Amino acid sequence: MKTAYQHTKKGQSCFLRAGLLMLLVLFCSVSGWAAKQESIKKKEINKSFNVGKNDILQVDNRYGNITVTHWSKSEVSIRVVIEAKARNDEKAQAIIDRVNIRMEKMGNTVSAVTSLRSQNGNGGSNESFTINYYVNMPSELTCDLTQKYGNIIMPENNKGKCDLHVKYGNLNGGNFTGPLSIDVQYGNMDISDVDNATLDLAYCGKSSIRNGSQLNIDSKYSNLSLGNVRKMNTEAKYGDIHIDRLDNGYMELKYGNCKIDELKQGITVDELSYSTLTIKDLASNFDKVNVDARYGNLNIYIDVNASFRVVANNMKYGNCKV
């Protein structure tokens, strides 16, 4: 009986090994079959245009990135790379065929626009595509760039006028010595130094400018970090602002907080509603701090050598402590 029992166990062991081997072979076969289901198709479009100092570049793209680099040529070169992924070559090619890129020069405007033809049926869950623009242009050229569902990446030094629009993506750039207009929604922004900039921010988790000479800011549901700012005009709602150093400013702040580490000259706050403004270091030779606060808090740390007068008019539901 003992020998028969051992023989039966060996038979079961062999059977289990054979079964596991069959499952392993089947798994490898299925994995190999599944891996073959992804097909990748690419298409590249290249065009170049001669430009002068008064020309304008306009790019309107979606589902990808716009990456700009500068060169010394009086020419704009645009390379568009379209990449589609699908279960088979036919479906990947169908995605490529949906994408239309129109590039032309009319008058003094070079334009490149992405459009998508309507899709036949519903796309599969494992289908995707990207449309990436790579632009070479003179640094002094005026540009108007719009990117939806993707990012705009600008070079280190930008000398021309720039209008930059990003929705559902991020904006990254270096220094801007020409007029700059920025519109970012549902994304982040990181800029180095600017001379004159207008910012329209909405639902931006993190936005930053290292240094600014003149800033005009409209911010909603966004957080903004600024370095050294000479002059700023700001309207902010539902978000926080941090400024390292400010010379002079005007502000309306609602349902948010603003912290200024160092204020050199003065600030006028026409409305401080359900918000807190904190000035950590007010220069001893400051000019004026004028704040209209309604259900808000104002905290100012003043140099011990400063000479000043406090005027608190029409105070309700609050205290003034010096």
Where does each model-flagged region fall?
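Eukaryotic tandem repeat interaction scaffolds
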Residues: 222-298
